[in-house]
């Protein structure tokens, strides 16, 4: 992992490595039921995985969303998690909790704006908006929705680029893009200087939510 030295299973080391990074790779792992991911810091300019920092598992058949981020691939203690506030979360709001169960932020899908172009908001524990994210290309967003509504032969359109712009105070401060040509979903998240002071746990939780919860 470029420029990052961390014990594979040391929670403090993993969190420190996350907070010092501005570029992350999210790799979906094939599982017959449920979503799993690996989070790593790729080398500059690369879209290949670095050494895994976090292993992410979405709880199977859960009544409420339960997605945990762990420093090891087993089912040991988690460092943080995404959890729905209610059994049926119609508002698209999900809390991000630390290892002690304290709320550190909130992810919210704006369903009104997402009808034509997916739109998310990320807030801190006090409810203050930290940044918003929306699909980079409105035409691609419309084509993807059209493909979902018509016959199967247009299903290939769902493989169009799935890219988001991250905006803070009206300024673009990051990007999130799918790496094409991979069997399993792979995304690269890049953060600019405008992300200083934003808890990286919230940013990583958002990146995973875009794949795991996008269609909820």
What is the predicted function of each stretch?
Residues 2-216:
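Intrinsically disordered, low-complexity proline/glycine-rich segments
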């Amino acid at each position: 992992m470029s420029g990052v030295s961390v014990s594979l299973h040391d929670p403090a080391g993993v969190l420190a490595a996350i907070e010092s990074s501005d570029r992350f790779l999210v790799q979906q792992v094939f599982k017959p039921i449920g979503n799993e991911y690996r989070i790593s810091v790729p080398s500059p300019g690369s879209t290949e995985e670095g050494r895994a920092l976090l292993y992410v598992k979405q709880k199977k058949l859960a009544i409420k969303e339960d997605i945990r981020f762990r420093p090891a691939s087993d089912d040991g203690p988690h460092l943080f998690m995404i959890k729905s506030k209610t059994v049926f979360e119609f508002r698209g709001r999900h809390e991000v909790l630390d290892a002690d169960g304290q709320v550190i932020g909130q992810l919210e899908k704006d369903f009104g704006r997402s009808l034509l172009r997916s739109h998310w908001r990320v807030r801190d524990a006090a409810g203050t908006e930290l940044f918003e994210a929306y699909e980079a290309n409105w035409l691609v967003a419309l084509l993807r929705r059209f493909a979902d509504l018509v016959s199967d032969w247009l299903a290939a359109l769902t493989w169009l680029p799935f890219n988001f712009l991250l905006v803070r105070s009206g300024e673009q401060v990051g990007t999130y893009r799918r790496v094409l040509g991979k069997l399993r979903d792979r995304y690269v998240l890049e953060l600019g200087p405008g992300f200083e002071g934003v808890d990286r746990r919230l940013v990583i939780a958002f990146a995973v939510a875009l794949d795991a919860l996008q269609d909820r």
